[in-house]
Amino acid sequence: MSFTPGKQSSSRASSGNRSGNGILKWADQSDQSRNVQTRGRRAQPKQTATSQQPSGGNVVPYYSWFSGITQFQKGKEFEFAEGQGVPIAPGVPATEAKGYWYRHNRRSFKTADGNQRQLLPRWYFYYLGTGPHAKDQYGTDIDGVYWVASNQADVNTPADILDRDPSSDEAIPTRFPPGTVLPQGYYIEGSGRSAPNSRSTSRASSRASSAGSRSRANSGNRTPTSGVTPDMADQIASLVLAKLGKDAAKPQQVTKQTAKEIRQKILNKPRQKRSPNKQCTVQQCFGKRGPNQNFGGGEMLKLGTSDPQFPILAELAPTAGAFFFGSRLELAKVQNLSGNLDEPQKDVYELRYNGAIRFDSTLSGFETIMKVLNENLNAYQQQDGTMNMSPKPQRQRGQKNGQGENDNISVAAPKSRVQQNKIRELTAEDISLLKKMDEPFTEDTSEI
């Protein structure tokens, strides 16, 4: 006896926009294109999973009994815990709850700026022995296939489930038994980006769909609304960003004005909350390096947390809990040196701490961490020594290379004997002149 999902206990089937057999119909799994009349537009046929053109995506060759699960975060794995992952279907016993999820690589679309954007994949469930991998055994390692089965199912035999005929059987909203953990970064089509609690999801979708039915019934001859899918949301978001000129692919240009604003914003924060970067250097945030602030040198003082080597050091930074509970703390009142004399003085306190960060050679990236620490610990001492060295004499403009050592000698006028401050003895002539200066002056009245 073959089983047909959704043919039994229709009252427990997911509520919503019900068609003849009480099963939801989804835009990505509809069998025929319906003509939808819209205001001022030509009728557009709905695209199904089999009618989509393979522009950067594969075509789903078979119809799944269930709505898909769409990925909305990159880098997230599609996986379920053992014994989980098979959707609930009225009329299908637990012994037949076995199959696989098939990854549908969706199409790409062109954004407003002319770039192609690839949509994240969507997964569809097929019972064992049906769908695109009907001839493959359970557990076969296939790219884009994830095998699931309940604990009561025998995975050595195919499921006794009929293939879905889209002309008579419509897609069932995907629901899971209580306790099923939905993969992180994925959401079930038609349920929003919600938690994996299938019952609450079903009730929420039931209330939303019934409210939508009442609004359509009250609208009279109002034209029916078209279905909104996550694909449309992605396209709308890209168009809005392009219209506003906020393309995420283009780096934001930092001008002098914006750099000044960023620096002022950082300096307005309390000292312990500042994060130095290219716009606000380490010295601007925390002052010059010295015995009490002895970390940082070279490029790290210029780039701060933007330095490529800083993230690996940040792994050593203690958490807030480790800071308070793993350190020796001391509260001290200090003199307030900020503010004008006319302003009321505030009480200023310092929470002084003393602790240690312990790590060993088994830490990931140990060699790199030691290299960065050795380069930046007490680096100010080497910098001070470099600054105290006499600068290299610079060649004057217009002077050619290869001249002798005399080129670097000063050409200033020689100093006089007085400037040289040399001691010499008086001669007889000097003594005679000094005596004449001491004699009284007499006017010569003789006539020539």
From Swiss-Prot:
The modification Phosphoserine is found at residues 167, 191, 390. The keyword Signal does not apply. The modification Phosphothreonine is found at residues 174, 427. One of its GO terms (molecular function) is RNA binding. This is Nucleoprotein. Residues 1-55, 158-231, 383-420 are annotated as: Disordered. ADP-ribosylated. The ADP-ribosylation is retained in the virion during infection. Phosphorylated on serine and threonine residues. GO terms for cellular component: host cell endoplasmic reticulum-Golgi intermediate compartment; host cell Golgi apparatus; ribonucleoprotein complex; viral nucleocapsid. It comes from Bovine coronavirus (strain 98TXSF-110-ENT) (BCoV-ENT).
